[in-house]
Amino acid sequence: MHIMEGYLPIGWCIFWAVLSAPFVIYGIWKMTKMIQEDRRVLPLMAVCGAFVFVLSALKIPSVTGSCSHPTGTGLSAAFFGPFITSVLGTIVLLFQALLLAHGGLTTLGANVFSMAIAGPFIAWLVFVGLRKTGKVGIGVAVFITAAVANLVTYTVTSLQLALVFPVEGSILNAFIAFAGIFAVTQIPLAIIEGIICALVAKYIVRVKPEILKKLGIIQDEEIAKIQGEAV
């Protein structure tokens, strides 16, 4: 989904950067506050950031000017919410643009909005909704959350490209074309990413449940159940 350097007109680059900025700025404040309150969250936060970096670096060529890959943001969205995830995603995208030529600096705002903001926000809403029912375990909830974050990211990227490159004057036709091409790779990738994130989440519950409990992600009863499965 990383839109490459120079692929978007400067006006759209500025638009997406301005739109993304408030989310990231608030996310920095929220992240700083959380760390000041309890520094024990730092290792898990770092793991989530590294997870985003590694998964989103596994790119597969796709639409001209972009690519397909997992996003890794669903896990962070589930654990820390969308604002902190927007900061982690921005850091990852900046490093990838500078060190891996993956994405770009002029298109950073557009890539941040799709992968670090839109995907995590919708995914977080899904996660919260599923968990509030009291009937969906953390493994299944994280699986769905990760898959949704992936698919929403590419839906937004399709829209971003369609706004700039309409097909026969039609943004809708362009959106359908871009989304259709992305779907070939992203649907399987979203499922795989969901499985990986679910396994990682359950592993963290087994080895470091107190952090997730403090974050309000999981309660003692479910912790005991998951840890019992590992015996």
Curated annotation (Swiss-Prot):
Name the UniProt record assigns to this protein: Putative cobalt transport protein CbiM 2
Gene Ontology cellular-component terms for this entry are:
ATP-binding cassette (ABC) transporter complex
What is known about its subunit structure? Forms an energy-coupling factor (ECF) transporter complex composed of an ATP-binding protein (A component, CbiO), a transmembrane protein (T component, CbiQ) and 2 possible substrate-capture proteins (S components, CbiM and CbiN) of unknown stoichimetry.
Q: Which domain of life is it from?
A: Archaea
Q: Which organism is it from?
A: Methanocorpusculum labreanum (strain ATCC 43576 / DSM 4855 / Z)
The record's similarity note reads:
Belongs to the CbiM family.
Q: Does the keyword Ion transport apply?
A: yes
The pathway noted for it is: Cofactor biosynthesis; adenosylcobalamin biosynthesis
Write out the function statement from the record. Answer: Part of the energy-coupling factor (ECF) transporter complex CbiMNOQ involved in cobalt import.
> What membrane topology is given?
Multi-pass membrane protein
Output one GO BP term: cobalamin biosynthetic process
Keyword terms of this UniProt record: Cell membrane, Cobalamin biosynthesis, Cobalt, Cobalt transport, Ion transport, Membrane, Transmembrane, Transmembrane helix, Transport
TM region(s), chain numbering = 8-28, 41-61, 75-95, 108-128, 136-156, 176-196
Task: List the subcellular locations.
Answer: Cell membrane
GO terms assigned for molecular function:
cobalt ion transmembrane transporter activity
